[in-house]
Amino acid sequence: MRPPCHAQVWVKSQYVCPNCGVHLAIGAYYRLSTVLDHGTFKELNPDIAPNDVLHFPDYQEKLAAASVKTGLKEAAVTAIGRIGGVQAVVAVLDSRFFMGSMSTAVGEKSHVRLSMLPTSTWPLIIFLPAAGARMQEA
C-alpha cells in the first residue's frame, strides 16, 4: 500500500509520506526495531496462536490471510529487550492483523507477559494501535 501521491520514500520517514503526510500502518517488528536497542530483542511466546472456539464461519481462512499478509500468527508480539540500556518487557499490537484486535491468544500473551512483572523491576511498555475485542472469539 502506498500513499495517494504514490511516493516511494515513506519507509525512510517511518511510514509517513514526506510528500502528502499520509501515515501508513507500522508493523510490530518494525516498531520494536525502532524502540529496542540493537541486538537486544528476544520474542516471548512466539508460538501462541488464536483459537477458533466458536467455529466462526471463514475465521480460519481470515486468520491464514492475515498471517500471510503480516508474517504474524497473531496481532500481538511480546518481547524483552533494552531501551536506552534499561531492560524492559514490551508488547506491540500490529494493526495490520485484524486491526490489532484482541483475541484469546493476545490475552494469553498478555497474561504471560504481565506474570513476569511482579518479580521484576523491569518497566512494561505496550503499544496499542488496536480496534478492540475480536468478535469471532467473543
Language model region names:
Residues 1-138:
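Terminal-region recognition feature
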